[in-house]
Amino acid sequence: MKYNQYAYVETSPEKATEELLAINFLPENYSSLSFSELLAVLTGNVLAEATTRQAKDAKLAEFAVDDQTDLAAFLLDTPTAITASQFANVALQLLGYHPNYDYSLTDPLTCGKKHALPAFKDLTSKEELIFTFYRLLNTRSKNGQILLDVMAGKGYFTQFWGEGKFMFFNGKSLPVFDTSQVIREVVYVQSDLDTDGDGKGDLLPVTVFRPVESQDQLKVPALYTASPYFGGIIDNVKTNHNVDENLTDATTWTNPKYVAKPLVKSPAPSDQDVPATELATGQSSYGLNEYLLARGFASVFSGAIGNRHGDGIRITGSPEETISQKEVIEWLTGDRVAYTDRTRRFETKASWCSGNVGMTGRSYLGTLQIAIATTGVKGLKTVVSEAAISSWYDYYREHGLVVAPSECQGEDMDKLAEVCQSNLWDGGNFTAKKAYEAEQAELLAAQDRATGQYSDFWESRNYRHHTDGIKCSWISVHGLNDWNVKPKNVYKIWQKVKQLPVKSHLFLHQGPHYNMNNLVSIDFTDLMNLWFVHELLEVENGAYEQWPKVMIQDNLEADEWHAESDWASDLGQASLYLPTADGDLSTVENGTGQLTFTDLGGTEFKKAGISETDWEYQFISGEEKWAKASLRFESEEFLHPTTLVGRPKVRVRVAANKTVGQLSVALVDLGTRQRLTATPKIFARGNQPFGYRFGADSLQEFVPDKATKAKLITKAHMNLQNYQDMKQPSKLEAGQFVDLEFELQPTYYTLPAGAKLGLIIYSTDQGMTKRPLETEDYTVDLAGTALLLYRK
């Protein structure tokens, strides 16, 4: 598998020498050393676990130069050069590869090519040797990290602890901060919101992890993770809403309104600055933050309103949620008051903060980055938003239907608010408990699970309407197989952000609701180090030009990443597919006639006692038990690999034998073959140290799995009663044909030669839609039905 490397910044030999000297890797007297002496010293310096020169020299005999000679013996002959094969053997061992197991000592160059390592060459001068070691320190090792990070995990940079300054290597920040003395503290930011109705601004607990060096004169930037889960998670999955119920006439919709909570203006910060008096007991929940904390970036967490030890109530997705999370940044930049404790007597400032703030986090944590960025708050320089919701309607609803996130059937805005209302665990907070109970009733009514329609309530929770306020640079990360936060969320915000006068990037990986910072196939953590150094430390390191605007992981070969200028339907050419009465999906033949299927609701699924995931695979694979409740059409085999891009569109002319109905459409890759695992395989657990004795991550990647019959590419759902307007329902008569036109979730998917494309038209999606208790007949008029794809 290829260890692709995008974060290496091309560097001149002169600059490389300066950087090697600065980190004490290249000795000051290097010019007086012979080639063999320099080779011994530089190799030994990689071995950070050996703390004396004698210990380092003693370990050289552990490394083979070829299948007959160890490095110590090789150096006894005082060589003045080393061949590409000899150096490759030493380098591969330094990078963590095992000779005779991972590669052959007689052919190390093949191993280097296999893993996409920089090419090895004959070295005949000290200058070449020095620069080659510079490149080696910046090369990804077997554990996925660059060799310099492996050395850091062994203690190399402890020699710089206490110096109180940032150090850089190849444009990235180095772990020179004393992680054994990280300051861990809690402060209480006062909000302008009074969501619990006690007449006082809500106090928002904020947890700070920062380098001890920031206690003196050093100002450090902050990485802020807005995490509603930080105070704890209330497990309420057993009380999720019932989805085994019949559909409701959507014309009962009343357009529920958003109602703002009262404001209580907080006092302006005074000159008082008392050190924090509460120690943090919470732990960082995000590995990238820990990695960068060792490199000088403070890590800040807050769940804001409704979180443990604080005031207020959770109001999922609301403007109040955005305001409260934004107020933490206002404290970091000196524009908002915070106190040492809940008595509100002593103010404390983020005097350690440089005023430059970046944001990190996945899912809800990524969502709040979007929300805060739209406010244009001062000090927020960049966001790295992973698997983020850009419209809460698109998370819990779709085209007039209640549609759950994957594996979250029955969850909704009220239930998520309860999950995050961790101050309910503070037994004495009776004010919050009373306000929470009232808010739960309001959320239940306003979210309108009966009709699933768009409303003012949902409009207030659509961040895409406020993108003009974004002033910070932008990175979005999303899984193309994320059926929790469906890809429409990132696709639609990307169409807005890419047009703004800010630097923006997009990463699309093959995962579900997952992080990508520790994949074999891409050096994402190094890219983020480079990015945050540029954005928060204001170092010109070429980060803006270092990698393509859009990077997309291939679904056939996980170690292939596609560089694109954009992610949109117009990357491809439009192709029209027409379903026919004999089950074909044709590009030439118009379908005629009508086909009918009977939806069984959730009755058979309940009897089967299988998981929603198992149902989906059996369904798309065509098992008769489930396939009979659908219409299925297959294309001819593709003669050449074909990539589908952007958002497919469907037009379906359909009639139901009831006055309500829901229609689902899925595109499926058909053909028995190996496909990538649904989640990455862990190659080595805990093998990527964040710093010296400071936690670790695990190397992982998608790999070929056992052969399967089919794979879901994309799908979508629609309420038949929205045939006239996606935002307003209409009456539906039994037997009335209506024309539904809607887009499926966006994709970037390659069908290999020999594969077939399947179109499935059905109704109940057991994992996402409501599961009616009654059967319903759906008749599709093929003459009014078509699929529009965009193909590369």
Swiss-Prot record:
It catalyses: Hydrolyzes Xaa-Pro-|- bonds to release unblocked, N-terminal dipeptides from substrates including Ala-Pro-|-p-nitroanilide and (sequentially) Tyr-Pro-|-Phe-Pro-|-Gly-Pro-|-Ile. The keyword Transcription regulation does not apply. The active site is at residues 363, 482, 513. GO terms for biological process: proteolysis. It is an enzyme of class 3 (hydrolase). One of its GO terms (molecular function) is serine-type peptidase activity. Pfam families: Peptidase_S15, PepX_C, PepX_N. Keywords: Aminopeptidase, Cytoplasm, Hydrolase, Protease, Serine protease. InterPro entries: AB_hydrolase_fold, Galactose-bd-like_sf, Pept_S15_Xpro, PepX_N_dom, PepX_N_dom_sf, Xaa-Pro-like_dom, Xaa-Pro_dipept_C. One of its GO terms (cellular component) is cytoplasm. The keyword Protease applies. Optimum pH is 7.0. It is found in: Cytoplasm. Optimum temperature is 46-50 degrees Celsius. Its EC number is 3.4.14.11. Removes N-terminal dipeptides sequentially from polypeptides having unsubstituted N-termini provided that the penultimate residue is proline. Belongs to the peptidase S15 family. Homodimer. This is Xaa-Pro dipeptidyl-peptidase.
